[in-house]
Amino acid sequence: MLTLDKFEEASEKVKEVVLPTNLIYSEYFSEQTGNKVYFKPENMQYTGAYKVRGAYYKISTLSEEEREKGLVTASAGNHAQGVAYAAKLYGVPATVVMPTTTPLIKVNRTKGYGAKVVLHGSVYDEACQYALELAKKEGATFVHPFNDEVVATGQGTIAMEIFKELPTVDIILVPIGGGGLAAGVSTLAKLLNPNIKVIGVEPAGASCMKASLDAGKVVTLPSVDTIADG
């Protein structure tokens, strides 16, 4: 369960690894929308994305024995680099399974942080299934990119920073891919202000959340069409 205590704990822990990403006021979008619009530039993190938050916090909760057995994850890019970088800081071995279609630059950057990269499957789901099997075989901890409450708690620390810098915030727009960021941010935002509105935004070509809400159950799309590859 995602709780305020855990979010506060995670917020302190991720300070060890994240760079400050102060809100940036957008005059253009403020004029276009008739609102005061700010951006939270998480692309300025060392690994290029917020994903390191969840990965770093996840590792911090593991026992020494679990860390010694290593980590396994699956990702097409950003989560891979987040786990690899966080694992390097903790001195923990990490294996990242990436689809064979992953851009070479993301593969090389993940390797650059010290992780072992295994290319398997043409899509994320195939890579993920193989990673789960590998983690079980090796007795390692599988760090899911989104379907993990600890990881989601780490991602949600973004909301804590937003509220500290802009206490009067009344709407937060959050991107949705797997849903880990949205789960963390929306949960913490509602804990801090029950009246706040959180709006999830996803690519039209990868709208699994909308499809799931419309169907009233989890829906898996046969394919996606988006440049946001994870």
Describe every region a protein language model picked out.
Residues M1-G230:
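PLP-dependent amino-acid enzyme catalytic core
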